[in-house]
From Swiss-Prot:
Modified residues (Phosphoserine): 27
Any single GO BP term: cellular response to nitrogen starvation
Keyword Iron applies: no
Region described as Disordered: 1-21
Localization per Swiss-Prot or TrEMBL: Membrane
Descriptive protein name: Putative uncharacterized protein YLR173W
GO cellular component: fungal-type vacuole membrane; membrane
Modified residues (Phosphothreonine): 24
Membrane topology summary: Single-pass membrane protein
InterPro entries listed in its UniProt record: Tag1, Tag1_C, Tag1_M, Tag1_N
Bilayer-spanning residue ranges: 55-75
């Protein structure tokens, strides 16, 4: 048998097979061990990574906490409280009003202008605003204040840079925030945006709508006029949104709703109102008559046309602009005249006083006011016949004499009523609203100085046929005729009985060689006569007054000069003397009686 037969080969394989199997298992075990070791190493590395991440995370939390605490401490040390921020921002904010244009009245935000019945006043405002952070209070010697300022400036200039404000609504009250104290609402028609950089001037032009509560505003204006600043308690309820535009997107930063602003915290009412009140007072004080015409009326009274000197409305307020063609409509003025104490308490129901429409120029200068007056008699008894204890005159006599004395003032009260004439006068204030103003304001006292000087009223005094002689019982007697001529060129009349002088009293002082030697007292009322004349050259009205001098109760002031005067009369037949006359005249008019006092005049005359 051959040794290399197939059978032998198979036997050899079978013999060798057990010997080969243990080597394969050992290799497999080695591979498994390697894999286990690799897995363990990977697990260990993963665990170390997790531990490292955990440590880093915990360390990050600690660092962030420390950093957060540091930031909080920094903010606490550098960022002032909210109330300090608000107060100090007012100090660094600068505002200048360039133009305040009253556009007119509207029914609502979307409507056109309607000056007849509009409820909202549209106002166009041009103003400038800028921030001067150097004005932050206390930075000169307080490091905390400087840190606070630097923080606010950094946030404003580097972070915010610009902001915008939507003025949704601002409701203002005087007193508690209830309806009865409401002054009005202000609504913004467009956002207002400005730059927060240091001393960067922002030119702002925007429109607002104002819906006033007239009756309450008038009450507040009265407080200003009466300088009653202590009772002012003006607050505003703010509804506004502060936002920023970035990348074409709007980001709301702060929404203020029901935020209360107390205006006395930022405004000194007495200081800010001083200039406007002074301007208004100067305007009233400057009112004077430019022309005055009096004529008889068909109702047995008088009609008076009064033209005031052109006045300036709020002169010097260059920033205020009125709508072109604006006017004040026909207004009927209800008048009360002063009583004995000078208080305007006597109503005059028979007086009708109204102004013609007043055109308000754009420059507010040279505004012409014309008043038409219709008055019938008789006037109230308390005006004509009540005797005032301080001077035994009636209130009417006191008024007339004050008018004729350029050094005296007269206080009267007036309340207006709008007269609807059916013509579109483009009124500055809608008629119904203006009527509400007048009714709420009621009677407004006005003190004025009427520039109607009595010296201009007296044209000439004369004494004719004056004789000086010794009478019975060695009493000095003076007789003659006194004539007075009064300039009534303002009075258009052809009647003789509408105005007349019935009696006079007073005193005449006589001078010789500039020495007062004799006085003629007329303590009792003396009958007189008067006549209406018309100047032949001008046609102007005059009044001639005449009364007889016949008095034995002379007062000798200088006996020596009296002797010289009588000697001249004795040897020359006459002498020239100078006289000063001061008389009171009792008038009877279609309106009732009154007394003119202190009518003074002088002249020269011959004495025989």
């Amino acid at each position: 048998m051959h040794t290399n037969s197939p059978l032998r080969a198979d036997n050899q394989d079978l013999e060798t097979q057990p010997l080969l199997r243990p080597n394969t298992e050992e290799s497999q075990l080695l591979n498994d061990e390697v894999r286990i070791n690799v897995a363990n190493e990977t697990l260990i590395k993963s665990r170390w990574r997790s531990i490292k991440c955990l440590i880093i995370y915990l360390l990050g939390i600690v660092l962030l906490s420390f950093f957060g605490v540091s930031i909080v401490q920094y903010i606490r040390g550098h960022v002032p409280p909210t109330d300090v921020i608000e107060k100090n921002l007012v100090q660094v904010t600068n505002f200048k009003l360039v133009e305040f244009q009253l556009d007119g009245w509207k029914d609502n935000m979307g409507s056109d202008l309607n000056n007849d019945t509009g409820k909202y006043l549209q106002v166009s405002i041009h103003s400038q605003i800028w921030f001067d952070y150097d004005k932050w209070p206390g930075t000169e010697n307080d490091s905390d204040a400087r840190s606070q300022r630097d923080w606010i400036r950094y946030i404003n200039e580097k972070v915010l840079k610009t902001i915008c404000i939507d003025l949704n609504n601002v409701t203002t009250f005087d007193g508690d925030l209830v309806f009865k104290n409401k002054l009005g609402d202000v609504v913004g028609m467009e956002p207002i945006c400005f730059n927060l950089a240091h001393r960067q001037i922002n030119n702002l032009q925007f429109k607002i709508l104002v819906k006033p509560s007239i009756w309450k505003i008038v009450k507040v204006l009265k407080k200003f006029w009466n300088r009653d600043f202590e009772s002012l308690n003006i607050k505003s309820n703010l509804d506004m949104t502060i936002f920023k535009r970035k990348f074409g997107t709007r980001f709301n930063l702060l929404k203020l709703n029901d935020e209360i602003l107390d205006w006395k915290d930022i405004i000194d009412w007495e200081k800010i109102s001083a200039t406007p009140l002074r301007m208004i007072q100067n305007m009233i004080d400057g009112i004077s008559l430019q022309g005055f015409t009096l004529r008889d009326s068909s109702s047995d009274g008088f009609h008076a046309d009064m033209r005031l000197n052109p006045i300036t409305i709020l002169g010097g307020v260059d920033w205020l602009h009125l709508p072109p063609g604006t006017s004040i409509p026909f207004i009927n003025w209800e008048i009360k005249l002063p009583d004995c104490n000078g208080e305007p308490a006597i109503a005059i129901p028979t007086l009708s006083c109204f102004n013609e429409p007043i055109n308000l120029h754009h420059d507010k200068d040279n505004i012409v006011v014309c008043l038409q007056n219709e008055i019938e008699g008789p006037l109230p008894d308390e005006l004509l016949y009540q005797e005032c204890p301080q001077n035994s005159l009636t209130p009417m006599s006191q008024i007339v004499n004050a008018v004729l004395n350029q050094n005296e003032t007269v206080t009267f009260a007036a309340r207006g009523h709008v007269l609807e004439d059916g013509i579109d006068n483009n009124s500055l204030i809608p008629a119904d609203m203006l009527e509400d103003i007048f009714q709420e304001a009621s009677f407004i006292p006005i003190t004025t100085n009427a520039t109607f000087n009595s010296s201009e009223l007296i044209q000439e005094f004369q004494i004719n046929d004056l004789q000086l002689r010794w009478a019975a019982r060695k009493k000095l007697s003076l007789v003659g005729t006194f004539l007075g001529f009064f300039d009534l060129s303002f009075y258009e009349t052809h009647q003789q009985d509408r105005v007349r002088i019935d009696t006079i009293r007073g005193q005449i002082d006589l001078y010789h060689n500039d020495i007062n030697f004799l006085n003629l007292p007329m303590k009792q009322w003396i009958n007189s006569s008067s006549h209406i004349l018309h100047d032949e050259d001008t046609g102007n009205t005059q009044m001639k007054l005449q009364f007889d001098l016949e008095n034995d109760d002379m007062e000798v002031v200088n006996s020596l000069e009296l002797t010289r005067t009588l000697n001249e009369i004795l040897f020359q037949g006459f002498t020239v003397i100078h006289f000063n006359a001061t008389i009171d005249a009792s008038l009877t008019t279609a309106l009732g009686p009154w007394v003119l006092t202190g009518l003074a005049g002088e002249g020269d005359t011959l004495v025989t």
